């Protein structure tokens, strides 16, 4: 993935909040390229209720992952195994502090595919942390 290529990004998220479990799968067409051992991916998230677009980018580094969003939601989440990171999470309803406690981040690269597995706890505004497990699959088209 040296030059910018069309990619398909599939995200499967498993969320556990107490006894409640939820799974969501979203698929985004996007663009991506590799530079200096990092992968940069760009895609649009469209809110199904009001069709507002949030521009999203995913940077996959050898040891951690960054997700940035700009639009209806503004944030930059950083996933570093064994560390807690804090960021502002700006929504139309206000600004919150988001804490990301990353337990695991695994990255596997193949010729035209990247697989990422994240296991992390998310806490919004000091509320009880919710366990999240996310699988991200990036396939070059």
Where are the regions that the model predicts?
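A short acidic/small-residue loop/turn micro-motif
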Residues: 136-138
């Amino acid at each position: 993935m040296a030059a910018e290529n069309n990619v398909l990004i599939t995200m499967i998220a498993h969320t556990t909040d107490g006894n409640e479990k939820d799974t969501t799968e979203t698929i985004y067409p996007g663009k991506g390229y590799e530079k200096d051992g990092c992968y940069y991916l760009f895609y649009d998230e469209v809110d199904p209720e009001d069709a507002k677009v949030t521009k999203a980018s995913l940077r996959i580094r050898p040891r951690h992952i960054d997700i940035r969003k700009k639009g209806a939601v503004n944030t930059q989440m950083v996933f570093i195994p064994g560390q807690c990171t804090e960021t502002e999470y700006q929504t139309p309803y206000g600004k919150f502090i988001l804490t990301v406690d990353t337990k695991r981040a695994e990255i596997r690269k193949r010729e035209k595919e990247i697989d990422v597995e994240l296991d992390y706890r998310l806490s919004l505004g000091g509320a009880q942390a919710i366990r999240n497990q996310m699988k991200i699959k990036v396939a070059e088209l």
